[in-house]
């Protein structure tokens, strides 16, 4: 053994070839600060081996290196800029030493090589991969850019266009694509990976392969003519501006850095990468996006822990076909759980099957599946008008009309047709589970399972624990949602649960703005362009359905009369009374017509202004800041109340439910991350300016306490130790 660290070791393999093996104590290898330091120490040993002829890098895990240790990021990002820059210089000196070894080097890559893992293998001369490879640089999705030389080496290896596509989008690609663009030199089966790697190294050692020529382009300026450079970077910047926008600075920074570094050799180019990375790491956007990644891991880990002793349902059923029922049935079947879809008439069943078939055909058109797979999936969806087969069902979700009487009748009838241990769930969006459970003989086997529309796209499923729901019931439904590829978040029961409970105060803020003379078009523009929502409130209401919102508004008002009971007729009432239900009937705040692809396209409709004038004061202008404050304060206050009341268990789960269920702008990180970023005291000062608008604007006492003591909602993060103690020598 030449060297043994905590996460890697170095040993002789054969005939002058050494192997450096990543072998962390846990289930995966991460390129954390300790591993970078250990790699430097291993290279120091290697550099003294006079009989060294070649080096093989490999992993003892199912994946090569999954990336940097993102749990370190928040503390690293708090380190002063100069110290973070010094540490990056040290880390890059390690990878440069790997690249500068006087012998050929090869990385044998199995499974994932992402982020720092990808940057590590870019420093070797050759790369062999297994067919299950996923390789790429996802840093821009975390609000940063490659910092271990990825923005320097990848363009010089692949050419500007291919590298820009991967880096700016934060993409990872598979083995076939990686081989095609030259990111790997060969693809071999797992069992032949090491033999293949040694064979390539031997060819390089004997001179049959010119490893020096392979290495040289990575050390030099990017080979691009002025015209090629202008085209590549202009197109890349245009695409990034269109897709990322101003709220996500990392992709544009990465493109501009690669452009600026193109005329330099490795050392100067790495300095430019460093100068761009460090300021990005200190942005609120980076902290928010890293926070989302960590929260996602926390939520998924919690679901995994909850279901560790539970068998995933093998047969499911959906009550109520149509678009929602068909979407749920498709998702279950697509992910491998056969499903019975029951309705009371053929028309609805046909609609549900048509929806499932449409979604499968889209997969076929995109080349994701073939005809055989399509037929196999659709054959596991069984439409029926009766309860045949329900005695074999493990879990049933009811997705009928949002009417408590109808839901209770359907659930009570179904309970008599299934086994005693079968779990029943309701896809209600607002009706308390306690109320629906009152119709059942086995309320302990019942809970809520709130999908979001469209089911195949929206990652969140709210799992609602009723007062009598058993732990096993919740675990079974969480297991099914996870199997469907969804992110289940368990919440406690109340009208609207979590997501809709916090959404309707936001809509109430919108209604009050319109009542006071705001133009809905400006409100939408500000909330989309300035705050960053994917849709403004008027457009969102049109998509949800004005009739749906009108009904849900009444349910929420009955549930929380002190805050959500209106004392005036609002825009939603006016549109509802005029039968303007939104996209579903072509008229809402906007008029809708189908575009060439059959999708609804919104157009101005002057008639709506006359309609809204009857429920609004004369038009007046509001500043962007005032619009954002009046829209967001009711939502933030309600989110905080939900945490204080135990409706949602943690800030992390609340923020992920908002991002995955409502499209809360990821660069803000969620409501609690947004609160922590600006500080509770600053938020309180802002909110108090609007408390005259009513109870929805009154800040909860718990938040006032946070403001008084300057306490964040997320646990405080300490800056990483000074760079000198990060094992940098």
UniProtKB/Swiss-Prot annotation:
NAD(+) binds at residues 324, 343, 400-402, 407, 429, 453. Residues 1-189 are annotated as: Enoyl-CoA hydratase/isomerase. GO terms for cellular component: fatty acid beta-oxidation multienzyme complex. It holds the Pfam family 3HCDH_N. Its EC number is 4.2.1.17, 5.1.2.3, 5.3.3.8, 1.1.1.35. It catalyses: a (3S)-3-hydroxyacyl-CoA + NAD(+) = a 3-oxoacyl-CoA + NADH + H(+); a (3S)-3-hydroxyacyl-CoA = a (2E)-enoyl-CoA + H2O; a 4-saturated-(3S)-3-hydroxyacyl-CoA = a (3E)-enoyl-CoA + H2O; (3S)-3-hydroxybutanoyl-CoA = (3R)-3-hydroxybutanoyl-CoA. One of its GO terms (molecular function) is delta(3)-delta(2)-enoyl-CoA isomerase activity. Residues 311-729 are annotated as: 3-hydroxyacyl-CoA dehydrogenase. Residues 708-729 are annotated as: Disordered. The active site is at residue 450. Pathway: Lipid metabolism; fatty acid beta-oxidation. GO terms for biological process: fatty acid beta-oxidation. In the N-terminal section; belongs to the enoyl-CoA hydratase/isomerase family. Involved in the aerobic and anaerobic degradation of long-chain fatty acids via beta-oxidation cycle. Catalyzes the formation of 3-oxoacyl-CoA from enoyl-CoA via L-3-hydroxyacyl-CoA. It can also use D-3-hydroxyacyl-CoA and cis-3-enoyl-CoA as substrate. This is Fatty acid oxidation complex subunit alpha. It comes from Salmonella schwarzengrund (strain CVM19633).
């Amino acid at each position: 053994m030449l060297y043994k660290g905590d996460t890697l070791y170095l040993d002789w393999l054969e005939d002058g070839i050494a192997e450096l093996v990543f072998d962390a104590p846990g289930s995966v290898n991460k390129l954390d600060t300790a591993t970078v330091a250990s790699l430097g120490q291993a290279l120091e040993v290697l550099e003294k081996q006079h009989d060294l002829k070649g080096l093989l890098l490999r992993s003892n895990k199912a994946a090569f290196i999954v990336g940097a240790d993102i749990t370190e990021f928040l503390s690293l990002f708090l380190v002063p800029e100069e110290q973070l820059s010094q540490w990056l210089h040290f880390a890059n000196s390690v990878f440069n030493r790997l690249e500068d070894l006087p012998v050929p080097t090869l990385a044998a890559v199995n499974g994932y090589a992402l982020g720092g893992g990808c940057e590590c293998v870019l420093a070797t001369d050759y790369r062999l991969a297994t067919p299950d490879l996923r390789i790429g640089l996802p840093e821009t999705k975390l609000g940063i850019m490659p910092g271990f030389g990825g923005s320097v080496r990848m363009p010089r290896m692949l050419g500007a266009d291919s590298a820009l596509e991967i880096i700016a989008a934060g993409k990872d690609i598979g083995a076939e694509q990686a081989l095609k663009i030259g990111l790997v030199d060969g693809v071999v089966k797992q069992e032949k990976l090491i033999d293949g790697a040694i064979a390539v190294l031997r060819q390089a050692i004997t001179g049959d392969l010119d490893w020096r020529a392979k290495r040289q382009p990575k050390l030099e300026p990017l080979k691009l003519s002025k015209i090629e450079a202008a085209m590549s970077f202009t197109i890349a910047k245009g695409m990034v501006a269109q897709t990322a926008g101003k709220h996500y600075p990392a992709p544009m920074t990465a493109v501009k850095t690669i452009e600026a570094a193109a005329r330099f050799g490795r050392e100067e180019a790495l300095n430019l990468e460093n100068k761009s990375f460090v300021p990005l790491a200190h942005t609120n956007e980076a902290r928010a996006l890293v926070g989302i990644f960590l929260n996602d891991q926390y939520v998924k880990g919690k679901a995994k822990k909850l279901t560790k002793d539970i068998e995933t349902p093998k047969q499911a059923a959906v009550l109520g076909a149509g678009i929602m029922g068909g979407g749920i049935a498709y998702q279950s079947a697509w992910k491998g759980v056969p499903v019975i879809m029951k309705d009371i008439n053929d028309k609805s069943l046909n609609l549900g099957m048509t929806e499932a078939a449409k979604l499968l055909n889209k997969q076929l058109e995109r080349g994701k599946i073939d005809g055989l797979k399509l037929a196999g999936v659709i054959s596991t969806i069984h439409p029926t008008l009766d309860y045949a087969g329900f005695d074999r069902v493990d879990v049933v979700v009811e997705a009928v009309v949002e009417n408590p009487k109808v839901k209770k009748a359907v659930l009570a009838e179904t309970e008599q047709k299934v086994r005693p241990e079968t779990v029943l769930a309701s896809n209600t969006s607002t009706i308390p589970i306690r109320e629906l459970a009152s119709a059942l003989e086995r309320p302990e086997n019942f809970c809520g399972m709130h999908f979001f529309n469209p089911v195949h796209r929206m990652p969140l499923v709210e799992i609602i624990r009723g007062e009598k729901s058993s732990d096993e019931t919740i675990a079974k439904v969480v297991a099914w949602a996870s199997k469907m590829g969804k992110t289940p978040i368990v919440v406690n029961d109340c009208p609207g649960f979590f997501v809709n409970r916090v959404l309707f105060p936001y809509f109430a803020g919108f209604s009050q703005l319109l009542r006071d003379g705001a133009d809905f078009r400006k409100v939408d523009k500000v909330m989309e362009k300035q705050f960053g929502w994917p849709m403004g409130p008027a457009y969102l209401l049109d998509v949800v359905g004005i009739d749906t919102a009108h009904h849900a508004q009444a349910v929420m008002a009955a549930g929380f009369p002190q805050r959500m009971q209106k004392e005036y007729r609002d825009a939603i009432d006016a549109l509802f009374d005029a039968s303007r239900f939104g996209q579903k009937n072509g008229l809402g705040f906007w008029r809708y017509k189908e575009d060439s692809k059959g999708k609804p396209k919104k157009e101005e409709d002057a008639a709506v202004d006359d309609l809204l004038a009857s429920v609004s004061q004369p038009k007046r202008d509001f500043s962007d800041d005032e619009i954002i404050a009046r829209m967001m304060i009711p939502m933030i206050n309600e989110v905080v109340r939900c945490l204080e009341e135990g409706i949602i268990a943690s800030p992390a789960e609340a923020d992920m439910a908002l991002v995955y269920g409502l499209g809360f702008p990821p660069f803000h990180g969620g409501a609690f991350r947004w609160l922590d970023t600006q500080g509770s005291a600053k938020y309180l000062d802002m909110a108090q300016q609007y408390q005259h608008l009513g109870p929805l604007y009154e800040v909860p006492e718990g938040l006032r306490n946070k403001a008084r003591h300057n306490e964040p909602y997320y646990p405080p993060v300490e800056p990483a130790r000074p760079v000198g103690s990060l094992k940098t020598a």
